[in-house]
Structure formats: structure tokens, C-alpha cells
Amino acid sequence: MKNFSKILLAIGIVVGGTLIASTPARLDYVPLSNENPDLEILLSEPLEQLIPGTEKRLVWHDGEQRTQWAVVALHGFSASRQETAPLANLVATSLGANMFETRFAAHGLKNNGLVGVTAEEWLDDVANALTIGHLIGEKIVVVAVSNGAALALSMLDHETMQNVDSLILMSPNFAPADPKAMWITAPGGPLLLRMIAGDTQSWEPHNDLQGRYWTTSYPTKTLIEVIRVVDRANEKIESVKAPRVQVFYSPNDSVISTAALLLAYEKIQTPQKEINKIMKTGSPSAHILAGDIISPDNTLSMAEQIEDFILHQAL
């Protein structure tokens, strides 16, 4: 009996150690500040590896000169700048602003999309995007979707956020629709994820253009990086004051938890915030709220709402 107890103890130690060892690291990474930013270097990327139309894009409003406003667009997980286009461009035009649309690491690739990418790389991408925003405009408006919104909130206390006037958050991800997915970053989460979901995630695009500009098949373990970002975003909104915040969401969203979104919205510390419920979308998941590819009918009205929010600051 004593030997049996020892065996059970040994098994427990091994299993416990394995679970702890497989626990994803907390996302505490702080991107380094770029003291002497070079716009050309910040915009550089391996174009030959990218699907045309997914590359970073800088649009000058009136020649290569700084404008009062700068619009910085951050797309969602597995997507590209085409996700809600031309929403950011419409907002920039109405503000007389320069615009930068980023491409997150491992997105928009012709081959091996989302392979080996980390949340730390995405935070670097946000820091670089905001640095570009500072170079092209005095006050930055961030238009961010889903995981891009969570990444923006994850950077609230970073110095690159200092010139951000407004955060426009579309379907921000504070938790997946399936609450069980949050255990991905718990002890043993990655092991369970692989056992339950397999090595690869694949999904059917809504139309040909979504199939072209989104990554529709990727390693399941990449979802761990998404939840690491979500965990950090939830931490930051409770402890760090945000710029002005405007949120758009659909109560029928089947990708993110709207209950978690509404709870998080109440916690956001900001001098001005607004939340807008979008009832009709062209998205089967009700997650992509604007853009020519999925929800074209909402794009113009949403751009007008964003412009109105930006230009009419609370006293």
C-alpha cells in the first residue's frame, strides 16, 4: 500500500509538473521605444511573401506632410487590412487625415500563415503602428477590430499611446463566445487544446474575397497567443486610464462574448466613451460589422458615427 501511495505521488508530481510546464507565459512584454524612428524602415516588409492587398499601407491626405489627425487601423486575428475597408479610409478623408493600415506578423502570407507567431510580435506591431501614427499626425485615432482592439488596449500604458486621442473598437475581444476557451492559458491549457481541437484550425470563408484576404487555416496553438492578448487587455482596462473610447458591437456576435464585452466596457476608465449596438450585418457570425467584403451596408453610416464622436468631445 505504501508503494502504491508513492506511485500515485510520483504520478501526481509528473502530471503537475507537466501541466505547469505547459502553462503559457503571462504577456508582460513591453515593446522597446523607437527613439529615432525611420518611416521607411517601419514600413518595410517582405512583399514577395505577401498576398497583394494585405501589405501595410500609408495614405497621405495632401502630400507627405503631417496632419492634425492620423488614423491608424489595426485588423483582427487571421484577417488583413481588407477586413473593414474602406472604413478607416472614409474616416481619414472626413478628418483630412493621413492614414496607416498595418499588417500584423504572420498575417497575409501566401504560405505558412500564422505559423510560429507570438503575441509579443503583435505588440511590437502595435508599437510600430502608433509610432507611424505619431510621425504622420498630431492626434491619433485608432480604428481596431476584434483582436486588434484587444491589442490596442493591451498597450494602454505604453508611451506610444500618449498621442492617441480616440480608440474606435469594433467587436473588441474580451473573451471568446465559448467561455471554455479561456482555459487555454491556464495550467495544462495548451495540452488540452491540442487533445480537443487537434493541430490545425480551418474554416470556410463567406465569399471569395474573404478567402483571399483572410488566413482560413492555421495552427491551433496560435489561439493561445490570442487568449494571452485577451488576458492582458482585461487587466489593463481595470488599471490604466484610456483615451476616449467608442465601441461598436453586435448582440448576435458568435465569435466573441458580448457579455464579457459589456462588462469590460463598464470597467474602461476614460474621459469619454460611447457604445453602439449594430443589429444588422452581412456577416454570418455578426462579427465583422463594416467593410465592402462582408458588411458594406454599414460602412458609410459607421464612418459618420466615428467622425461625429471624434469631433464632438465631451466637455
Task: State what each model feature region is.
Residues 28-56, 172-238, 278-300:
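The alpha/beta-hydrolase serine catalytic core
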Residues 109-136:
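Catalytic nucleophile-loop/oxyanion-hole region of alpha/beta-hydrolase
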Residues 51-104:
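Short, surface-exposed "cap/lid" segments of acyl-processing enzymes
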Residues 59-65, 213-283, 296-311:
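Serine-hydrolase catalytic core
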Residues 1-40:
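N-terminal membrane-anchoring alpha-helices
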Residues 103-108, 173:
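Short beta-to-alpha linker loops that shape the active-site pocket of alpha/beta-hydrolase fold enzymes
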Residues 143-152:
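Gly/Ala-rich beta-loop-alpha elbow adjacent to hydrolase catalytic centers
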